[in-house]
Amino acid sequence: AHLDGLSDPSGYLAQLRELLGPNAWIVVEKILAVDEALEPTLPVDGSTGYDVLREIGGVLVDPQGESPLTALVESAGVDYQEMPAMLADLKVHAAVHTLASELRRLRRCIAAAAGADHPLLPAAVAALLRHIGRYRCDYPGQAAVLPCALAETHSTTPQLAPGLQLIAAAVARGGEPAVRLQQLCGAVSAKAVEDCMFYRDARLVSLNEVGGEPRRFGVGAAEFHHRAATRARLWPRSMTTLSTHDTKRGEDVRARIGVLSQVPWLWAKFIGHAQAIAPAPDAVTGQFLWQNVFGVWPVSGEVSAALRGRLHTYAEKAIREAAWHTSWHNPNRAFEDDVHGWLDLVLDGPLASELTGLVAHLNSHAESDALAAKLLALTVPGVPDVYQGSELWDDSLVDPDNRRPVDYGTRRVALKALQHPKIRVLAAALRLRRTHPESFLGGAYHPVFAAGPAADHVVAFRRGDDILVAVTRWTVRLQQTGWDHTVLPLPDGSWTDALTGFTASGHTPAVELFADLPVVLLVRDNA
């Protein structure tokens, strides 16, 4: 369960820590805003890793794709600059309609605590929630969030001042009104963001992930390194993850979709052609679903009955969650039938072979990003979690798709053979963590910078003194330009790649370093 749904998260965790003892590993499922840090007073080891998931996926996104992909989604009639306003309206709708019973109960609590009621009190609560950009804001380190939100709400809607004053008076005393306001805040955020907005934003859907912020087009290397170093210092035992039971897409599906940031012109051409041949019932819905179809499309082009069923199930869930033309509470069967018919046309018509060709063209780049993400998740500061089935390529979408039974027999065979690149990375990194625990759990994080024309295509860092990790990114552009004398300066000593056995020292050419795989896991010899 999410931490923020509890009435007293801090008190609960204090009791849990006392019960389990000082050495028990406790991490909390907490969705952090981009500008929010985990509360340092909580007696836990960290979060379950949605924050790290955003950082890893984001650092592999090509920023050059932002403008053309924004233009593409706006060609479908969306003003992308209005997305924040849309999200704010969704929060109000969630409070007033979806969670109306909770809002009524909160109103009664506030009125009782403040000793007065007002007709505008429910509207004031809903408007206030528009301005709280996180799931919960009553942790000690966030004491300034609520008064700032009250000020912003008063500034934009001064007519709600009487209701806002009642809220402030009731919440200041703590107790049930304060608790229920925070619980409603988290529920409203979940309904508006995860359960609706993430199904409307069709710019680059790999960014529409739990803990994500799609309006930020990826994560720069500076931000990535700073957040990793901070985690090493403050939360070295926090969890890192790429896939969970709640992620909107599996890690490898996100990696493939993320490649579209590198080829926006190619994707725009495909979408334009697709819309001419098989126009979607709604252009934005079509762009959203096309990215997901691309993300799970088999390299062979052979769409099994199982995949067809999974895609139809996903499409129906997606359009109901988006709640533009249909919804769970008010299904529009005609629109849903049109979407299912369109999807069958996509799967069976001439576009299927074109999509197969596009997937084949980009698959090596998708696999490169997937390997990079996996190695980063296993080696950045924190304790890595490997979600069920993600040891090999995984084509899962949202639940229940990501909760299918795992074929452990196939994975046991792959682990023994160590031929699959993903399980090679996984096995090597986990073995290294076991033999060098001081480098990972206690070791510092130090960025390492490549030098040369293609330096931006490398993300590298040291863990402790004896482990160096480097991954490749933006490989479509890299394929065109080549490494062009780019080097990675290795610290003193001789280094061996735990994945390939390649040995290097000093200023090592990137073309040699990444000759076999797009990632390296270097260990200092005799360490």
Q: How would you name each of these model-derived features?
A:
Residues A1-L6:
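Conserved short loop/turn motifs at secondary-structure junctions
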Residues D8-Y80, L87, H93-L99, A113-P119, ...:
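Carbohydrate-interacting/catalytic domains
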Residues C109:
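Conserved AAA+ ATPase "sensor/coupling" helix adjacent to the nucleotide-binding pocket
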Residues R130:
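Short polybasic/polar patches that bind polyanions
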Residues G133:
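Acidic/aromatic/glycine-rich contiguous surface patches that form carbohydrate-binding/processing clefts
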